[in-house]
A protein has these predicted regions:
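Positively charged n-region of N-terminal signal peptides that target proteins for export
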Residues: 1-4
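Bacterial N-terminal signal peptides
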Residues: 7-15
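Chalcogenol-based redox active-site neighborhoods
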Residues: 21-244
């Protein structure tokens, strides 16, 4: 009888744990989902997201806290890249659980810093105040196994139709690679524009991939090239040059 009770208890715990994990995952947005909406105050005024940004690519960055070393370097890097993001038609939104007044003080301070011996930059993108944690919980930015009051380093790339196209999560001790985020953004834009795929370690301007057929064609078909810009390494591996 005792053994049966132990077995039932272990079974109940396993089922409860699996249910809890599924419930947590189910509560977070996934790739292809509509970006959760929110209204909040920011350093540039009130934001109604994503309505204010529909029709544009946008990236939401969550960070643990203002006036912290890693977060400060990340925002200074983004400040240096503002012109590039504008060129790509991308709107940036920064979010944490800090107060709006703290955001404002932090921005003012960072705008005086000569980061990497460069002139100080003016930070034009909004920093959203999420003191009540509502937005953070909607997006899965607050993950209990890391911290219950601060966001992880989240990145959400959202397309002009307000669909989530890519997500990244970094631990609090590791700064984000802005070049990789930029690469992913341009890869998504390239894939959408040309109906192509991007290979491993692809860089903007590099050769892209075409969708492969499900079954190998005969050798005569394999030898055919529809364009001088198209080349094949195998029936399932077809590349195309976008830029000569």
């Amino acid at each position: 009888m005792k053994q049966i009770m132990i077995t039932l208890t272990m079974l109940f715990f396993s089922v409860w744990q699996a249910w809890s994990q599924q419930n947590v995952i189910a509560g977070y947005p996934m790739l292809g989902d509509n970006a959760p909406s929110f209204t909040a105050q920011s350093t540039t005024g009130k934001i109604n997201f994503p309505k204010d940004y529909t029709g544009s690519w946008k990236i939401i960055f969550s960070h643990p806290a203002d006036f912290t070393p890693v977060c400060s370097t990340e925002l200074l890097e983004l400040g240096e890249m503002q012109d590039d993001f504008n060129k790509w038609g991308v709107k940036l939104i920064i979010l944490s659980t800090d107060k709006l007044s703290t955001h404002q003080q932090w921005v003012q301070s960072m705008e005086t810093i000569r980061y990497k011996d460069k002139d100080p930059v003016k930070i034009d993108f909004p920093l959203v105040a999420d003191e009540d944690h509502v937005i953070s919980k909607k997006y899965g930015m607050m993950q209990p196994n890391t911290n219950t009051t601060k966001d992880v380093r989240g990145v959400y790339i959202i397309d002009p139709q307000d669909k989530i196209r890519a997500m990244f999560f970094y631990p609090m001790s590791v700064g984000r690679n802005m070049d990789e985020i930029k690469r992913t953004l341009i890869a998504l834009q390239t894939a959408d524009q040309h109906n192509v795929l991007t290979p491993a370690n692809w860089q903007p301007g590099g050769d892209v991939l075409l969708q492969s057929t499900k079954n190998p064609p005969d050798q005569s078909e394999l030898a055919k090239q529809t364009s001088p810009d198209v080349y094949q390494l195998s029936w399932y591996l077809t590349f195309m040059k976008l830029n000569k």
